[in-house]
């Protein structure tokens, strides 16, 4: 999740790699990119001799709104969008070719930290207008205040008290 779901501008991939190296240097065994319950179970890990198991579950499944059009091409959950950008190196726009296409106008429904990341990423990938669409008022936005301020500084437009 650290490498795929968080934008480069918030958490550089080189820092994640260094921190993982620091952890393994302490003698911690890491099993990354494993789907617990499919390729490996917790019981399998204990059978391998592990005394403790930490399950870093990452982000949960997205909540879709069940509205017409949400299954159209170009409609993603924020986590899927961020993962696509990270895996396809979209954060290196101009340096590497990437198949991540962002429209001229982008709407991000929701106002949490992940929504701010998605909006700021879309803006950085060239979207001319990026909107945060949120059903509640400014005082109820769940994102950290500094994340909201960064989004506004980068030109993200907030449409509050709106519900698609």
Protein language model annotation of sequence segments:
Residues 1-164:
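Residues forming the flavin
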């Amino acid at each position: 999740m650290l490498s795929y779901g968080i934008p480069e501008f918030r958490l550089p991939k080189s820092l994640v790699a260094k921190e993982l190296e620091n952890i393994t240097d302490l003698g911690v065994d890491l099993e990354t990119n494993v789907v617990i319950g499919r390729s490996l179970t917790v019981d399998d890990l204990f059978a391998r001799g592990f005394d403790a198991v930490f399950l870093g579950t990452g982000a949960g499944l997205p909540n879709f709104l069940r509205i017409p059009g949400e299954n159209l091409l170009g409609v993603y959950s924020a986590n899927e969008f961020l993962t696509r950008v990270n895996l396809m190196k979209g954060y290196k726009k101009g340096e590497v070719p990437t198949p991540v296409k962002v429209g001229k106008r982008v709407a991000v429904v929701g106002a949490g930290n992940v929504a701010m990341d998605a909006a700021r990423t879309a803006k950085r990938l060239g979207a001319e207008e990026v909107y945060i669409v949120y059903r509640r008022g400014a005082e109820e936005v769940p994102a950290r205040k500094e994340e909201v301020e960064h989004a506004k500084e980068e030109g993200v437009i907030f449409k509050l008290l709106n519900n698609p």
